[in-house]
Amino acid sequence: MTLLQKEYNDVAYISGPLLFVNAASDLAYGAIVNIKDASGRSRGGQVISVTDQNAVIQVFEETRGLDLATASVSLVEDVARLGVSKEMIGRRFDGLGRPIDGLPQVVAEQRLSINGQAMNPAARAKPEEFIQTGISTIDVQTSLIRGQKLPIFSGSGLPHNELAAQIARQAKVPGHEGDFAVVFAAMGLTQREVSFFTQEFERTGALARSVLFLNKADDPAVERLLTPRMALTTAEYLAFEHGYHVLVILTDLTNYCEALREIGGAREEIPGRRGFPGYMYTDLASLYERAGVVEGKPGSVTQVPILSMPDDDITHPIPDLTGYITEGQIVVDRTLNSKGVFPPINPLPSLSRLQGNGIGKGKTRADHKNISDQLFAAYANGLDLRKLVAITGEDALTETDKLYLRFADDFEQYFIGQGDQDRSIDDSLTVAWGILSKLPQSQLTRISKDAIDKYYGTKMDEMWKGSRSLG
């Protein structure tokens, strides 16, 4: 401690991970502090509330061993900051930005506040460039657009971790492969999940263009609140200082929100819906709204937050509030997963509100929008007929109805259930045509005659042309 550094010794009480310090109203909200006990051991902490009477500090480690009479607090930094550098690409960090890959600390080019800076709405450019994830259901029916924030709604026990890893290794902006990067932040991981992501990124070579932030379930709750902000600060730096197109994958936001609730409970705040704090909407918006494209800047930040819906309830506050802020959703389906379909993405409740901006002639392919609409209509019809067959049997169906039933089966098996293949958008559209061509031309009411003349009749053996397995 320097001679000019002030210490705060009047610790009023300790509640769980929180310290309440009297006469510390001059500490700033968000400041990083150092907490010492009688033995001289130091712990980090962050100021999460300041009033005229006291300051509330969230301790980054356990509070065991801290004594009210001997504990002291001193200021380290006015706000939580992260040292950022282009050399972070290819590295693994914990939730606080400390290296966990056995390599030295990154030499920082800048130290930036993890809260970021508000993006001027007038400076935002319209997102209109297609990002290819290599997953047919996403690319064709719920297209991800550069600068968009498109969440994935999953559930407990569903393979959203595998889906996240697949998107991370396959995603690219066609024509910009050299300046595309992935920032991956995972919160509340078990040790098995940490091993899975570490091995998967290394095995597939995805780590070479990625920055990983891995927060474990046994880490302090406050670290889960800092992890996505560390990731987004890194993404903004790579995008707007070095011109990268950055895809940020955040998983699992449910763990983040539960940490928010845990800290709110320790602070004895009045709870909102289902015990979550009333400011959760604002807090989530402070994360999601950091995605975008800025006029005059070469890079961009695109977000794919992943959250597991408790009890598969899409009206739960976490997915509900997320839906208000973001631009659509991709829904992982338990029924498809039980059939062994991977990735089990159900296109019917899924939606990309910006899809129309980034697909079509000159962007993907002229027939893209028509194919997407026709797949939605035909699959919905096939599912309705499945329900009818469960009641009346197939004898009551027409020949066309039976073709729709077969279409629904083929759609799930070949289009949705692609496994670990990395498909280009042309591959995915070829698969779609191969399945749609089993329906009579008269049923393809959402596709132009020119497209039907050009593509109708695609054979099943052509469906896999250009596809490759990464298994």
Curated annotation (Swiss-Prot):
Q: Which UniProt keywords apply?
A: ATP synthesis, Hydrogen ion transport, Ion transport, Transport
Q: Does the keyword Ion transport apply?
A: yes
Sorted alphabetically, which SUPFAM superfamilies does this protein's record hold?
C-terminal domain of alpha and beta subunits of F1 ATP synthase, P-loop containing nucleoside triphosphate hydrolases
Cite the InterPro entries for this sequence. Answer: ATP-synt_VA_C, ATPase_a/bsu_AS, ATPase_F1/V1/A1_a/bsu_N, ATPase_F1/V1/A1_a/bsu_nucl-bd, P-loop_NTPase, V-ATPase_su_B/beta
Q: Name one GO biological process term.
A: proton motive force-driven plasma membrane ATP synthesis
Q: What does this protein do?
A: Produces ATP from ADP in the presence of a proton gradient across the membrane. The V-type beta chain is a regulatory subunit.
What protein family is recorded? Belongs to the ATPase alpha/beta chains family.
Q: Which PANTHER family match?
A: V-TYPE PROTON ATPASE SUBUNIT B
Quote the protein name from its UniProt record.
Answer: V-type ATP synthase beta chain
Q: Which organism is it from?
A: Deinococcus deserti (strain DSM 17065 / CIP 109153 / LMG 22923 / VCD115)
Q: Which gene encodes it?
A: atpB
